[in-house]
């Protein structure tokens, strides 16, 4: 909702249910989704992604699922991210199933935007969606030419809620009990060891 504006173009990789949902989200934002399709149960093919990037040099994002919940298959986040960056695109990664369950190095691999859920490998109660945007993605959000279509999902407002560069503002009531659950789950991951949890 934040990294693509009406009239924008994004490459969306589909190898299961949640790749299809990414396509729908791009289109709901008024963008054009260039589809890279792979069979269910197969990872996203980086060669197909590269071909789409070459055929559509005016695209701004590549969106894909790290670990497709509907099949359990994992795609090569590091390689796809590198390809996208080589073509001037940002990546949006759905890691709802992958976070903590398999290797994921958000900063080292320079992932621009990523989201997850607390209810999968984090083993915390449902209700929170951990997200991360790097500085490049945050700057793109701040420099949008149009408002994000959803007030609730507008990260400019949420960054103000976090007191980032703006005066602190009220955006929502945080689900405190879920935050306590997430805190405990993270303590358990730390106790086990992150790399051990990938095994």
Feature map (PLM): residue ranges:
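Active-site-proximal loop->helix
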Residues: 21-32
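Conserved PLP-anchoring active-site segment centered on the Schiff-base-forming lysine
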Residues: 4-20
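Active-site phosphate-binding strand-loop segment of PLP-dependent enzymes
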Residues: 43-100, 113, 121
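Short beta->alpha junction loops
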Residues: 36-42
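Conserved active-site segment immediately N-terminal to the catalytic lysine
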Residues: 106-119
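Short beta-strand segments
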Residues: 13, 37, 63-66, 94, ...
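Active-site C-terminal subdomain of aminotransferase-like
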Residues: 119-198
């Amino acid at each position: 909702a934040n990294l693509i504006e009406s009239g924008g173009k994004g490459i969306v990789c589909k190898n299961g249910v949640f790749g299809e949902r990414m396509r729908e989200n791009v289109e709901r934002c008024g963008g054009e989704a260039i589809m890279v399709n792979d069979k269910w149960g197969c990872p996203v093919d980086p060669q197909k992604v590269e071909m789409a990037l070459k055929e559509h040099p005016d695209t701004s994002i590549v969106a894909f699922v790290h670990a497709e919940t509907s099949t359990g298959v994992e795609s090569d986040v590091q390689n796809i991210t590198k390809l996208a960056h080589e073509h001037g695109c940002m990546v949006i990664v759905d890691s709802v199933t992958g976070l903590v369950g398999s290797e994921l190095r958000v900063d080292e691999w320079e992932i621009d935007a990523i989201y997850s859920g607390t209810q999968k490998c984090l083993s915390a109660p449902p209700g929170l969606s951990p997200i991360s945007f790097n500085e490049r993605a945050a700057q793109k959000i701040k420099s949008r030419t149009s408002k994000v279509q959803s007030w609730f999902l507008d990260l400019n407002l949420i960054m103000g809620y976090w007191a980032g560069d703006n005066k602190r503002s009220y955006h929502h009531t945080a689900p405190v009990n879920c935050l306590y659950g997430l805190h405990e789950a993270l303590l358990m991951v730390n106790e086990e060891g992150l790399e051990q949890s990938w095994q």
